[in-house]
A protein has these predicted regions:
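Nucleotidyltransferase catalytic core that binds NTPs
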Residues: 1-217
Length: 217
C-alpha cells in the first residue's frame, strides 16, 4: 500500500514555497507521490488571474525531473465548466483511482478551521463535510496564529474523528510564506521576483507577458 498526497491550490503562479512545502510534507508523512491539483477557472470561491493552460504549463515546468511530484488535470479538465468543485468529489476521484493506497488531502490549518466552523451558518460550511471527514484522510499544515488542536476540539464533527488516523498534523517548520499574490504584484509593478519561483516559471511568465497589469488582491 502506498501513500499519496493531493495538494490543491490555484498555483497562480506556483512558487518555490509550494514546492518546498510539498517536499517537506512528503518527507514527514512518508508519501510516495504528491499530486499538484490546480483549480479550474470558473470556481465560485477563487478568481484566477491566468488561464488553466498557463498555470498547467508552469506547474509542469516546476516539477519536471522530480519523480515524487505529478500534476493532475482532474479539476481543470474532468470538472471543467462546473463551479461546484467540492473537495468531496476530488477525494472520491483519487480514492477510486488508487483504491489500494492511502490518499490524503493536503491543506492548511486555515482550511481545517473552515470545514465545520461553528460560527458560520450551516449552509456556508464545507459541502458534504460529514462524509468527507468520515471517509478520507488529511494532512494539515500549521499556520501562524492557528491552534489546530483547539479547532478540532471545538468542532463536534472533527472531534469525533480525532482518532490519530484521520488527521496528520504537521505543526513545525512550515511557516515560511511567499504568496502567489505577492509575486503577481511584483511582476505588475515591474519588480524582480526571480528568486521566489522556479527559473523556468519565471522565464515562462516573462516570455508570455503574464501578470503585467496592476492587480487588485
Amino acid at each position: 500500500m502506498g501513500k499519496i498526497g493531493v495538494y490543491g491550490s490555484s498555483f497562480d503562479p506556483v512558487t518555490n514555497v509550494h514546492l518546498w512545502t510539498a517536499s517537506t510534507i512528503a518527507h514527514r508523512a512518508k508519501l510516495d507521490k504528491v499530486f499538484f491539483l490546480p483549480c479550474a477557472n470558473g470556481r465560485i470561491d477563487k478568481q484566477m488571474k491566468t488561464s488553466n493552460e498557463h498555470r498547467w504549463e508552469m506547474l509542469k515546468l516546476a516539477i519536471g525531473g522530480n519523480p515524487l511530484f505529478e500534476v493532475s488535470d482532474y479539476e481543470i479538465n474532468e470538472r471543467a465548466g462546473t463551479s461546484k468543485q467540492y473537495t468531496w468529489y476530488t477525494m472520491e476521484y483519487f480514492k477510486s483511482r488508487f483504491p489500494k493506497d492511502e490518499v490524503y488531502f493536503i491543506m492548511g490549518a486555515d482550511l481545517l478551521e473552515d470545514i465545520d466552523n461553528q460560527e458560520l451558518p450551516v449552509h456556508l460550511r464545507w459541502k458534504f463535510r460529514e462524509k468527507l471527514i468520515a471517509n478520507h484522510k488529511f494532512i494539515v499544515m500549521a499556520r501562524d496564529g492557528i491552534d489546530m488542536l483547539k479547532i478540532i476540539s471545538k468542532s463536534p464533527l472533527l472531534r469525533n474523528y480525532d482518532d490519530g488516523n484521520t488527521f496528520h498534523l504537521i505543526d513545525k517548520g512550515l511557516s515560511m510564506e511567499i504568496s502567489s499574490t505577492y509575486i503577481r504584484d511584483e511582476f505588475a509593478m515591474g519588480g524582480e521576483p526571480r528568486y521566489l519561483l522556479p527559473d523556468q516559471c519565471y522565464q515562462y511568465i516573462v516570455d508570455n507577458k503574464l501578470y503585467q497589469k496592476a492587480l487588485n488582491s
